[in-house]
UniProtKB/Swiss-Prot annotation:
It comes from Mus musculus (Mouse). Expressed specifically by cells of the ciliated left-right organizer. Residues 1-18 form the signal peptide. InterPro entries: C1orf127-like, DUF4556, ZP1/4_Ig-like. Keywords: Signal. The keyword Signal applies. This is Ciliated left-right organizer ZP-N domains-containing protein. Transmembrane segments: none annotated. One of its GO terms (cellular component) is extracellular region. Disruption phenotype: ENU-induced null mutation in mice produce heterotaxy.
Length: 786
């Protein structure tokens, strides 16, 4: 009996010992155990489309910062970072004050230390206790959010002359206790979806989509972006701490489309965001794809990403729906594009439809598309590109040299395509990107032609480019379609705008055409690709020796003023996989022709007080005879430069080789849009007797092939050197825009090179790649987040 009582007492003592006598049998201390932060535990993690947030009490903010400083310290460095905010941004974190006191800690799902745990995002954070220095003396908290299956990055905008309509996926509920969605206009007026008619809105709620229609006259806000007026619908859906954007921008109502179509995309997240946030977040465009065309211009400012496309590539027409008396037509267009921001996990898909007012005929609706704009914005920063994919070994690269950024708006050069009847047409691309004065970025890319792809068969993979700002090296990169009037959908084109990326690739199926052409009084010009006149380059050493004794302003050697005419003969031996080209060497024009050009306004005289940007375009193409005297392959370099002539080449003429295509070339006046007297003094090429007139001294030089260098590959460089008074003519060839081409409202004046429809301007190119290195922008484009 006494034994059982002793057992009972022993059990009781063992139970009460830790509470009554802690000093008798000490157990493990609780000091080293992490304790949850009492203030943080009362708050709940809020999950949004791209990030999760947690409200931190003021008493724990310093402890959280101490932990962040420790985990974000560089490896091997014992010093704490001086600028914590910059490190937080790079790591996908954000710590900012809240309305009701305390702070809001936000972490992107793609941020540092965020792990994917089954179907959840998980982040473990710690908050040091006051005065603690060891990790064991910290409070731990785990942030966890489920992965959202619904893709909310889609928006469709329909711009009608009388209303604006926005369609978006229906936002999912994050929890069972979420309040119903309400309409918020300008962040002030709030109404339920059932009372939307009181605000003048029409709401259509489907199974997966929500469509809201607003009249243009009442609720829209007028806004100026790049000297362009817009009508903005500042509409949001709000519920508790969540907000869902229905903002959309449409151009002003017009009956005649302009030369370019601009799509304005707000720089904001399209998913669920935190409502009422004071954060002004900066989103960085990284990737862009336009579905309908491969020629477009990209720019951005603080609030918008602007994509501009030539009107002729998108415009369509339809009969007016309300036309009763007259059969009028209504012009419209549709643009589908994808835009990816560096701070978002998935790209946004944007669709814009715009309908113009009805007009009497199709010609009236498209009249303004052939008229270039007169108002141009300020200059923009230069971009360069590097190939992201390895081009074929047989395709020579098209190199774009660096040019310094000028304070004055630089001239931009648009490179247009020219068709060639080869089985596999080699391509080269240009892309023009400049920097506006406000720190925006402009990118013009047109890598391929849909008309050429129809002849080529299967399309090549879509082009991709990583573009990043470079404050000092603008590069010229652009190209145009072969048929300007073609408005059908074309292949997709990708432009990547990576702030930290240093590589890009542009694959284009377009050949170069660098020399303009004008009509003249001679016989009609019919060019054939079958006859071939083989002309070799005059060696630079030989020409320099002849130039040393020739009189001033004379493009020919002294004592040899006679001319010889070389008649072309039909080529009897076909060249496999490569057509025969008509090659002719153009001597310099006469002063009388210069005077006529000056009277016609086709020559630009640069201001001597301002520096002029002079681009250099180098194209590499094999000669007609692909093997030199040594039997090794010979490559030909063509250098078309508008810079001042060097001392040794001061008096030499242009000795570049050009090729022409086999079809009737249209009159350039059809593009100019005005009746202009034809210029005289132009060389003529007929079909019966195709002739190339050269100087006797030059013919003597062409009969000899220069010796190949020891490296094996013969490299000939043909750089046009302008005699006195001719540098303005060279500038006119590259800086005189044709009225048939349109100017971007986002870039400075662009001088258009002639397209493939003009005679004598086909420069055989190859599938090219362009290289560059870009630096990230220092400007901060921030957008308020509701």
């Amino acid at each position: 009996m006494w034994g059982s009582v002793a057992v009972v007492w022993a059990i009781c003592l063992a139970c009460i010992q830790p509470a009554v006598f802690p000093w008798i049998l000490p157990v493990r201390s609780n000091k080293d155990r992490p304790r949850p932060a009492h203030g943080a535990l009362t708050e709940k993690v809020e999950c949004f489309s791209d990030y999760m947030t947690l409200q931190i009490p003021s008493s724990h903010v310093q402890g959280l910062k101490q932990w962040l400083v420790g985990v974000l310290r560089l490896p091997g460095s014992k010093r704490a970072p001086n600028h914590l905010d910059s490190l937080l941004t790079k790591c996908g974190y954000l710590l900012h004050p809240a309305h009701e006191g305390g702070f809001i800690f936000r972490a992107l799902y793609s941020g540092c230390f965020v792990q994917k745990e089954k179907a959840n995002y998980r982040l473990e954070i710690r908050m040091f206790q006051k005065g603690a220095k060891r990790l064991k003396q910290s409070d731990r908290y785990i942030m966890r959010c489920p992965m959202m299956v619904a893709r909310l990055g889609e928006q469709s905008v329909r711009c009608h002359p009388s209303f604006i309509q926005v369609s978006r996926p229906w936002p999912p509920r994050t929890d069972a206790g979420q309040t119903p969605w309400l309409l918020s206009l300008r962040g002030e007026l709030v109404a339920s979806l059932e009372d939307a008619s009181l605000m003048g809105l029409e709401v259509d709620i489907g199974a997966t989509m929500v469509t809201i229609q607003s009249p243009r006259q009442e609720l829209l806000q007028r806004q100026e972006v790049w000297n362009t007026s817009l009508e903005l619908l500042p509409l949001w859906l709000v519920s508790g701490s969540y907000a869902y954007s229905f903002e959309a921008a449409c151009p002003l109502v017009s009956s005649q489309p302009g030369s370019e179509i601009s799509v304005h995309i707000p720089k904001q997240r399209l998913g669920l965001v935190k409502r009422g946030s004071l954060v002004e977040e900066s989103l960085s465009p990284r990737f862009l794809q336009v579905q309908q065309t491969d020629t477009f211009t990209v720019a951005e400012d603080r609030d918008f990403v602007i994509v501009s496309i030539p009107s002729m590539r998108l415009l369509q027409d339809q009969p007016c729906q309300k036309a009763r008396e007259s059969p009028g037509t209504q012009a419209f267009y549709r643009v589908d594009l994808s835009l990816d921001f560096a701070e978002m996990d998935s790209p946004v898909h944007w669709t814009v439809e715009n309908f113009f007012q009805c007009v009497g005929s199709r010609e009236d609706s498209l009249f303004s598309t052939v008229t270039p704009r007169t108002t141009l914005p300020t200059q923009s920063p230069g971009w360069e590109t590097t190939p992201a994919e390895t081009p074929p070994a047989a395709s020579p690269p098209l190199q774009t040299p660096q040019m310094a950024v000028l304070e004055e708006p630089p001239q931009h050069f648009v490179h247009q395509s020219a068709k060639e009847s080869t089985k596999q047409e080699l391509a080269a691309a240009f892309m023009q990107i400049t920097r506006p004065a406000r720190g925006s970025w402009v990118s013009m890319a047109s890598p391929s032609s849909s008309a050429m792809q129809e002849h080529q068969g299967p399309q090549t993979p879509p082009e991709k480019a990583d573009l990043s700002p470079h404050p000092q090296t603008p590069a010229t990169l652009s190209s145009e379609h072969t048929e300007v009037s073609q408005a059908g959908p074309g292949p997709s084109h990708y432009v990547s705008l990576a702030p930290n990326s240093l590589s890009t690739h542009l694959s284009s199926e377009i050949t170069s055409s660098l020399w303009p052409s004008w009509p003249s009084d001679g016989p009609p010009m019919l060019l054939s690709s079958e006859p071939s006149v083989k002309l070799t380059e005059v060696p630079r050493a030989t020409r320099a020796g002849q130039d040393s004794i020739q009189p001033s302003r004379s493009p020919f050697p002294p004592g040899e003023l006679s001319r010889e005419t070389v008649n072309s003969t039909e080529s009897t031996e076909p060249i496999p996989r490569e057509p025969a080209y008509i090659r002719e060497e153009f001597p310099p024009f006469t002063k009388s022709f210069m005077s006529s050009l000056a009277e016609e306004g086709l020559i630009f005289h640069p201001d001597p007080k301002r520096p002029q940007e002079r681009p250099i375009v180098k194209a590499e193409k094999p000669l007609q005879n692909d093997h030199g005297p040594s039997g090794e392959e010979t490559r030909h370099y063509l250098d078309l430069s508008t810079s001042e002539p060097s001392q040794e080449m001061k008096e030499l003429g242009v000795d570049a080789t050009f090729t022409t295509s086999r079809r009737r070339q249209p009159d350039a006046r059809a593009y100019l849009g005005t009746s202009r007297p034809e210029l005289t003094g132009r060389p003529r090429v007929g079909t019966a007797a195709l002739q190339t007139t050269l100087h006797k001294g030059l013919l003597a030089s062409t009969s000899e092939r220069p010796a190949a260098p020891s490296e094996g590959a013969l490299q000939l460089e043909s750089a046009p050197s302008w005699p006195e008074g001719w540098h303005d003519l060279g500038a006119a060839h590259t800086a005189s825009p044709l009225s048939s081409h349109t100017h971007s409202p986002l870039v400075p004046t662009q001088a258009m090179f002639p397209g493939s429809d003009e005679p004598g301007n086909s420069l055989p190119g190859s599938q090219g790649s362009v290289e560059s290195r870009l630096l990230p922008t220092t400007d901060s484009h921030q957008s308020p987040e509701l």
